[in-house]
């Protein structure tokens, strides 16, 4: 089910590393897979790629962000059983809990897809005194730039989804 090794991805390109993390099946104790452990140089490369992508992402239309998130929903749904099995192996979760976490992943991306086209500003009434008659304030929500996340290990799909999906939705 799992590949022998997994790279890390930077700017949509697979990256290998000199150091790998062994991942053991929590039930059998056997080696399940190995994943690349990025070094400081790879982290700097990822940060540079994120900074470079900031403007194009800011200009990415809400409907396009929605389409990306909906594509994720579709792909996660197709691979639901595979994702649940990987959670069982990697995190030691019972299959029922793992399946529930995959469902939550899908729901989080679905909700983010729905909200991607609803992230708007506000019109504020500033007519708080006679001298302010006809005054209004306007807000507009705009992406600020790259974000970084640190998530705990106990819900690896769910807790990452709660950071990544809204970030994509917001641009």
Question: What label would you give each PLM region?
Answer:
Residues 1-28, 125:
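Hydrophobic face of amphipathic alpha-helices that form TPR/SEL1-like repeat modules
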Residues 32-120:
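Glycine-rich loop-to-alpha-helix module at the N-terminal edge of alpha/beta enzyme cores
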Residues 12, 29, 65, 109, ...:
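Residue-level signature of catalytic and energy-coupling elements of molecular machines
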Residues 126-170:
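Conserved small-residue-rich beta-alpha loop and adjacent elements
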Residues 8, 88, 117, 130, ...:
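Short glycine- and Lys/Arg-enriched binding-loop motifs that mark or flank ligand-binding interfaces
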